[in-house]
């Protein structure tokens, strides 16, 4: 990303919510607002935000290859922190794309919560059947 010094200040943390949770969604909201102001939100920009997930996924894969030394030309060229950082970038890119296609961060947060709840029910059923 480019210079973020023009972003508005982060919202203060609510006492009843975990700091990480608030910071993630606050960061997503601020990033989406910044991207919307800079690039708009036409179909092309939406596609670019979706492609960003694939780009970050490729970087995570490259970090894993570097971590395991699977490329004999490079050997071990990455550490665990690089892999973790790239995986975090995948998550952030996905949340930004989710907020873009759902119409905003509150909608994305709600959809993700419902999706996780649905997956939890499914996992419970799968575990009970095992």
Annotate each language-model stretch with its function:
Residues 2-130:
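Flexible "arm" and connector segments at domain edges
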């Amino acid at each position: 990303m480019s210079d973020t010094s023009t972003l508005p200040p982060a919202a203060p943390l609510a006492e009843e919510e975990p700091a990480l949770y608030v910071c993630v969604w606050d960061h997503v909201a601020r990033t989406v607002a910044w991207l919307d102001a800079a690039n708009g939100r036409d179909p092309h920009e939406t596609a670019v935000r979706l492609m960003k997930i694939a780009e970050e996924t490729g970087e995570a894969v490259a970090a894993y290859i570097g971590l395991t030394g699977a490329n004999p030309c490079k050997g071990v060229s990455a550490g665990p922190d690089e892999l973790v950082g790239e995986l975090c970038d995948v998550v952030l890119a996905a949340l930004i794309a989710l907020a873009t296609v759902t119409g905003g961060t509150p909608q994305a947060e709600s959809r993700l919560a419902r999706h996780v709840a649905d997956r939890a029910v499914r996992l419970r059923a799968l575990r009970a059947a095992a």
